[in-house]
Amino acid sequence: MKKDEKNNMDESLEEYDEENYTSELDDLPEYERELILAKRHEEYMKKKHRRMLLKNLHIDEKSKGNIHDDTNKSIETSNKRKGKLNNKKLKLKKKLYESDEEEENDKNDKNDDDQYDNTYQSDEDRKKSNNKKKEQSKKIKGDNESYNIDSISYVKYKKGKIKILEDDDEKNHEDEKKKTDIIDHVSVTDDSYTDSSYKNKKKSKYKKGDTNQTDKTSKKNKNDKTNKTNKTNVSIKTKKHREDYSDDSMDDYHSTSSYEHEKSSDVHYNKKEKKIQLKVISEESHLDNTKNKTGKGLNKILIEKEKKKKKKDLHIVDSVHKNKEDGKNVITDIFEKNEKINKDKELELPQTPERLIHLYKEEKKIKMDIYNYMTYDIITYFQLKKTFLLDMCEHVHFSYHVIGHMIKIIDISKLNKVTNQDVQNTNNKKKIDTANENKKKIFFITNVIKSEPYFSTDRNTNIKFEVAHLENLAHSKFFKKIKNIMYQNKKISMDEIKSNEYYETYICDMNNISDQKFTIDEYNHIKLFSIDLDVLKTFHLFLKEKNEDLKNFRYTEKQLQDLFEKKKQKSFYEIYTNNKSIDNLPITRITVQREICSIQREIDKLNFDKKKTNVNDTYTLSKLNNQINELTKKINILRGNLDKARKNHAAMKSNDQFAQEKNMTKEKSRTNIKSTQKDDATNKFLGVKEMDISYFSKQIYDEKTNFNNMLSSKFINLPLDVHHKVVHHFLLGTIQNNDAVFYDDPSHKIKKELDAEIDKLLGLHGNRHITLFDDIKKNYE
């Protein structure tokens, strides 16, 4: 084995600091930290084990001399024809070897120290050390030049070692150098298992140290096999055994070092030919490799990689900002680029724990890129709307995606088309195609605590959702199906939701919708599909359209209130000054009545203050009197305008009704009736006589009480079964004409009795106890 590797191993083990290794991992999470520390501990134990093995191996200097003698003998036998040349060359070799033996031992230690220091030195110190080495190499090269004789070339290297090369071998040697350089580049990328965020946190010192250690371990793992075979041959006593051992061990070692070269060439050599090809590995090639690993070469590689990554990130950000304006499919571009990079890396690298962490981080980065692209539109949407009610059905046809924890039914025309289609007409392809286009899956939330006219809340999730008004859903079959599912309390699975059936209306709880595919934004409480890119695209388009609509909409609620108040003030000003009528102004009679009430309250307050004031304080009393007089004038003006508006409204109504009656029935006027009676009739019909509001309110109250008393008396007289059935019918609000609901027994006697009772109760026939929606529609049409 080489002395260089031994010294490097010893120094790296002696200067192993736990503080330096753990300080870089403080920012990482526990799981990643433990994995990285475990890997480092394994490397440390391998190095320790290697050092123990190397301590047991003791190769004497005599064995070294015997090795070189054997190589010389093999050269002499192979080159008998060129004996004279070989003798000269061998003499040169011996002289150079003897002269540089002392320099070799000193430089080994220096080079080992330099190699270790390169990993932990700064850039300035490294430049100085490299300049010194170049000067030393120039001196040595000046003394010892390269000799080219015929086909064999003898090269003098730094340490005084000669490399014997033939013409064919020179090319292979150059190829071997190229391969080692390529392997060094690959080793850096293979061992860089962490992602860019982790690399940025690491210091430049520890980068270089880790790359050295990983490259050394890759070489040492190859040499483990040779050490295992040589364990038994450690105790060597005689010279013959030592010679044999030295020959075998060096053959094995050099065969492993030139393993890649043998792999590339298909020629099989004999043992003698192998001895000719034994190449004492030069110090220059070793130093070149170490420079690439630890010196400027590695720094250049790492700097170039970081620059490329920064350029990529900047390119992605620029493309995102550009495509926001252009409206391109940026989400797909980000996803496809990252996916290609991941696939290429997965083919090259094995799936180690560190690699899995790296993949997880990359996936997270993709999702964050997409989400960051969408955040601008999401934030603007919520700033404009300021509510979590998203009308998703307006622009995007989602089958079941609940976004913002809300469900809303809007497209009632489509809903009616779905419900009006019959299930039996599935054979006709045209009808199926039209139904699939108009089809929409509808979901109702059960488990309701409170029910307002348009909103209700879920019991389990406390979600407020909007309900479509039931008067607009004008089909009986639709409500029958809803009632049946309500009785069953059916819980729907994902498979049923995804099924492509023809007739689909469901009721389900929010809890039954699975949240596995959703990612929740904790800041805005939005649920988004992070897997399906189509959903993200459609949601993004929806947000853009909604933002444009909301930006075009100028007024908020406060602004509308301000506008309404301004209109009121202008209209009242015109009434007071120009004596304009209410009908010509944008004000209703209710607003005028409210204004009168508010003015009356102010007058009452002023009168109360007037009573409290002293009689001697004439100034305040005069002020109060003036204010009261002005307000009373305003009230009188408003009341006069109100009376005029009411009379005009009544006259308009009477004229319309009178015209309709004339067209319907044209009766002859009676000549015998007196004119006074005619006037009274016309005045009553036209509503000329003024009636007090209190009189009308009393009349309405009396009618209500009489009706309630009549109903309660009839309900008490009825049997309990009929009572329960009627109440059940009104509470459920079922819309159907089914005898099974009301009549349990098939006997006609009971039917007749019940018909008579219901006729007494409702004043209707037995078959027409409930009016259908179809009848209502006909009446309204």
UniProtKB/Swiss-Prot annotation:
Annotated stretches, region: Disordered: 1-27, 56-268
Domain of life per record: Eukaryota
This protein's UniProt keywords: Coiled coil, Merozoite
Composition bias type Basic and acidic residues, residue spans: 57-73, 123-144, 170-188, 216-227, 251-268
Comp. bias (Acidic residues): 11-27, 99-116
Coiled coil: 616-655
UniProt feature, compositional bias: Basic residues: 80-94
Record's keyword annotation contains Ligase: no
UniProt keyword annotation of Cytoplasm present: no
Biotech utility: Possible candidate for an effective malaria vaccine as determined by epitope response in sera.
The protein, known as: Uncharacterized protein PF3D7_1225600
Organism in which the protein naturally occurs: Plasmodium falciparum (isolate 3D7)
